């Protein structure tokens, strides 16, 4: 991390950012009961700004939390060409954090199965998820923490609407399909711009994201650009949209599984009241 002892302005800004990220992360954890006493939290560390920030903020909160929980960092090395294997172990050893490097050659599997030019996202995601879930069970982790933030959640909402025909996003807390694992997203309330600024000041050893150029990544970038443009033109729109997914009114949507539209009946009592008023 850069030496801020002779740069009071930058030090003040870093402290403000850290306090804001701690407050929002703590609020998300409390709102969704993400971490409980005795939990073993497996923090998934990719080497990007989000997961580095998540690890640091969780360790901050751990030091002052009214409950006891442990943290173990896990990196999934998918054997992508050019991945710098030494960076994360060196960083985590210096930090004094318990960690595991999980080596799974999912890259070769995807390349072998998926035809050239076809999207690899679905298979890659399933293999990655399966590896992490399996390892969480192996080490007895009770929670799996991912570094998705508020902007990721909104981008996923629009991706699912535009390209999947579904009104869904990334929940801050999720039970896996088999009911064995609970996935949490402690940064759910945090802005990407705050995380970006914080990571720059902390000088994390960022591992460049080896984007595969898939259709899903291209679509996500289009949605990201759209949301950033909206926020620039109408400041506060992002906050409003995030508030919207916390204030859902099923009776004003069109999903018959969420609301019994067919069963709606006029209320005789309402007519009686109207008659009384008209008299």
UniProtKB/Swiss-Prot annotation:
[4Fe-4S] cluster binds at residues 121, 124, 212. A motif (PP-loop motif) lies at residues 46-51. One of its GO terms (molecular function) is tRNA binding. Coiled coil: none annotated. Homodimer. Binds 1 [4Fe-4S] cluster per subunit. The cluster is chelated by three Cys residues, the fourth Fe has a free coordination site that may bind a sulfur atom transferred from the persulfide of IscS. Its EC number is 2.8.1.-. This is tRNA-cytidine(32) 2-sulfurtransferase. SUPFAM superfamilies: Adenine nucleotide alpha hydrolases-like (SSF52402). Keywords: 4Fe-4S, ATP-binding, Cytoplasm, Iron, Iron-sulfur, Magnesium, Metal-binding, Nucleotide-binding, RNA-binding, Transferase, tRNA processing, tRNA-binding. NCBIfam families: PRK10696.1 (NF007972). Its cofactor is Mg(2+); [4Fe-4S] cluster. Pathway: tRNA modification. It comes from Marinomonas sp. (strain MWYL1). It is found in: Cytoplasm. The keyword Cell cycle does not apply. Belongs to the TtcA family. Signal peptide: none annotated. InterPro entries: Rossmann-like_a/b/a_fold, TilS/TtcA_N, tRNA_Cyd_32_2_STrfase, tRNA_thiolation_TtcA_Ctu1.
